């Protein structure tokens, strides 16, 4: 009887020990789980903080880049405004200079024409014979040609082959002696200055 009681006591002690071991294992597991959870939470928190720092750096860099772009845009606008103003001043200045050149050219031409007008007025006002009048006109023509020479105006050559760039054909004739496309007669003289045609020579052309 007493022996059975001892056996039961031993079994109870073993069960208690097993329960204690199991409880300790559970506590250890819970402690490990808690540690792992804390570690994971800590790592997640660190990752969040790092992501927030990266986001802040990105925003800061973007703001700096935007500021730099705005400054460059403002500088470009300023340069554009200055260039526009400079071009406008240049355009006005060149227009004024061009107007001055034209005005000077007109004056130079008129200086040569006025003496011709003087000669014509004197010829009309003079009391003389037809010969005197003719002589006065001839002098006026000479003065006109001299003025043309000073202005660089030349008479267009109308001899030889017809040139549509220089001549204006107002009549055509058949003349085997002259040959084809040759100026047969000049009706009105033409003039040029350098490569500019003042007036084409009016001619008759042989076909």
Swiss-Prot record:
SUPFAM superfamilies documented for this protein: Coiled-coil domain of nucleotide exchange factor GrpE (SSF58014), Head domain of nucleotide exchange factor GrpE (SSF51064)
Family annotation (Gene3D superfamilies): 3.90.20.20, Head domain of nucleotide exchange factor GrpE
Keywords: Chaperone, Cytoplasm, Stress response
Entry-linked InterPro entries: GrpE (IPR000740), GrpE_coiled_coil (IPR013805), GrpE_head (IPR009012)
GO MF, one example: protein homodimerization activity
Cytoplasm as UniProt keyword: yes
GO CC terms in record: cytoplasm
Sequence segments annotated as region (Disordered): 1-66
HAMAP family: GrpE
Function statement: Participates actively in the response to hyperosmotic and heat shock by preventing the aggregation of stress-denatured proteins, in association with DnaK and GrpE. It is the nucleotide exchange factor for DnaK and may function as a thermosensor. Unfolded proteins bind initially to DnaJ; upon interaction with the DnaJ-bound protein, DnaK hydrolyzes its bound ATP, resulting in the formation of a stable complex. GrpE releases ADP from DnaK; ATP binding to DnaK triggers the release of the substrate protein, thus completing the reaction cycle.
NCBIfam families named in the record: PRK14140.1, PRK14160.1
Official protein name in the record: Protein GrpE
């Amino acid at each position: 009887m007493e022996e059975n009681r001892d056996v039961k006591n031993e079994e109870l002690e073993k069960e208690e020990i097993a329960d204690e071991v199991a409880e300790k294992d559970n506590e250890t597991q819970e402690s490990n789980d808690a540690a792992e959870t804390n570690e994971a939470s800590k790592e997640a928190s660190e990752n969040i903080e790092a992501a927030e720092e990266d986001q802040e750096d990105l925003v800061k860099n973007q703001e700096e880049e935007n500021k730099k772009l705005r400054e460059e845009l403002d500088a470009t606008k300023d340069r554009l405004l200055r260039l526009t103003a400079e071009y406008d001043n240049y355009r006005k200045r060149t227009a004024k200079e061009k107007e001055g050149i034209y005005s000077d050219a007109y004056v130079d031409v008129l200086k040569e024409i006025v003496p011709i007008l003087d000669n014509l007025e004197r010829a009309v006002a003079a009391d003389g014979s037809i010969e005197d009048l003719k002589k006065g006109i001839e002098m006026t023509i000479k003065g006109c040609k001299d003025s043309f020479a000073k202005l660089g105006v030349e008479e267009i050559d109308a001899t030889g082959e017809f040139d549509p760039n220089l001549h204006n054909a107002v009549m055509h004739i058949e003349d085997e002696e002259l040959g084809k496309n040759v100026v047969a007669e000049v009706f009105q003289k033409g003039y040029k200055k350098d490569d500019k045609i003042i007036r084409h020579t009016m001619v008759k052309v042989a076909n």
